[in-house]
Structure formats: C-alpha cells, structure tokens
C-alpha cells in the first residue's frame, strides 16, 4: 500500500537504472503510470573505417565503457521487472500518445529521468505539484553529456561530482533547482563502483526530493541556476580520446587530490 495516494507519472528512459528508479519510487509512492522513452532513431549505415575506429576506441578505453556496462548489468540483475502499473512505450517522449496517457491519469507529480529533451505540449501538462527532473551532475556547474561524472574526473574537478533535482523547463538541464548535493567518489575501489555511488546517490536524492514535495506546501524550493553559480555545457562531440586518456590518468591519481574548492549547493529546506 502506497504511503501517499497522490498520483505520480514517471517519464523515463528504458535503461536498467531507470527501471531501478521506477521500482524504488513505486515501493514508496503511488506510481499511477510510466511512459518509457525508447529513444528509437533512424539507423544510418557507417563506413567500415568508422566501425573499425569505434572498435579500437572501445578496446583502448574498455575501463570507461566497461564501468557503465557493469552498472547497467548490476541494475538489470537487481530489478528484472518494471513496476506492475499502467505503462506506455514510445519511440520518443514527445509522442502525442505520451501526452494523452499522462492527461488521462491526471497526476499530481510528473517525474522525469533519462528521456530525450522534453518539449511542448508535454511541458504544459497539468500537475498540481509540477514536473521535476533528475540531472546526474551538479548544476549549474556541469551539464550535458555523455556523462557528467566522467567529465569531472577528466577535468580533475572532483568537487563537482554530484546530482541535481530541478523543475523541468525547455532547456538542457536549465530548470530552477529544488536541491543539489555533491558526492566524493575518490575512495571508490574502481570506476564501476564510482558510477554506482553516483547513481545510488541520485536515486536517493530523488526520493528525498519527492518526500519534501509531498510533505510541504507551495511555494517549494525553486532556485534559479544563475543565482547559484556559473557552469559549462559539455557536448558528446567534445568527449575526445584525449579527454578519455585524462580520465584514466586522473582516476589513478585520485588519492593525491585534495578537495579544496567549495561551491554553492542547494540543500532541501528542513521545513517549509
């Protein structure tokens, strides 16, 4: 029996870590429906040289690729099924079916994680509390992809590893912040465990943010990112072989780093 009967709809990706988050939420709250964005794209034929280059890259940087692959396997083993609730699978989160499915449920809260960029009319769908999003990076300092934790390691910015829960808007990780927290991963045994630490922290922060929203009344925490600090948007095309080399080198030297820089974070209010 859900502790709180207010209805939640989850918009999420299809990866095992999203399935884990959905199960954690459903174990505590009334998840009334889930829309799974399967990110289906039109396939394009690659040149043989591109295939060979990609294969060499994966072999050369297998520790990086392997860490994420292990994390997904770990979650797939722990959460074999999605919660037993109404579910819709779409090729894109912006499919009209996703909007219709959500309208029919009329949720109090919409929770977003791991989808493509959400656009109208979904952004304007009614929800009495609102639409919130998980960013597995510390906003406003680190945004984009392919992985904010990896960028922090490559840049030797260990103090910027963390997670953010924000109100969803039309930008890329630009919504007003509900809460942020940093996490120190330097004592992790390997990259696999480091990514597991960050993802588990992300799920825990999401659950605490939902609890905050459900146990308080408006106005909720809503901190403009520009009032917290300045950051950088990273694009996948910027994630070069040189950056991957730096990640591996910095990971090996992580114990030599002292976390001196202090940045502003946004704690959850103790009470409204």
What are these regions (language model features)?
Residues 1-272:
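One-carbon transfer enzymes
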């Amino acid at each position: 029996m859900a502790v709180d009967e207010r209805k939640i709809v989850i918009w999420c990706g299809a990866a095992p870590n999203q399935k884990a988050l959905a199960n954690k939420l459903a174990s505590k709250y009334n998840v009334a429906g889930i829309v799974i964005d399967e990110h289906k794209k039109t396939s394009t034929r690659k040149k043989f040289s591109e295939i060979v280059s990609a294969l060499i890259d994966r072999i050369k940087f297998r520790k990086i690729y392997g860490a994420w692959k292990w994390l997904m396997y770990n979650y797939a083993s722990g959460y074999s099924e999605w919660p037993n609730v109404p579910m819709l699978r779409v090729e894109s989160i912006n499919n009209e079916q996703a909007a219709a499915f959500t309208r029919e449920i009329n949720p109090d809260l919409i929770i977003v994680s791991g989808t493509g960029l959400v656009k109208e009319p979904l952004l304007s769908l009614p929800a009495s509390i609102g639409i919130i999003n998980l960013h597995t990076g510390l906003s406003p300092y680190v945004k984009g992809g392919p992985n904010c934790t990896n960028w922090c390691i490559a840049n030797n910015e260990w103090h910027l590893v963390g997670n953010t829960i924000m109100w969803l808007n039309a930008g890329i990780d630009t919504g007003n912040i509900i809460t942020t927290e940093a996490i120190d991963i330097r004592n992790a045994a390997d990259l696999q465990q480091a990514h597991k630490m960050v993802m588990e922290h992300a799920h825990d922060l999401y659950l605490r943010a939902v609890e905050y929203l459900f146990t308080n009344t408006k106005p909720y925490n809503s901190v403009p990112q520009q009032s917290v600090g300045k950051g950088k948007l990273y694009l996948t095309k910027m994630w070069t072989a040189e950056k991957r080399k730096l990640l591996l080198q910095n990971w090996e030297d992580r114990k030599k780093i002292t976390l001196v820089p202090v940045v502003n974070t946004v704690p959850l209010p103790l009470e409204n």
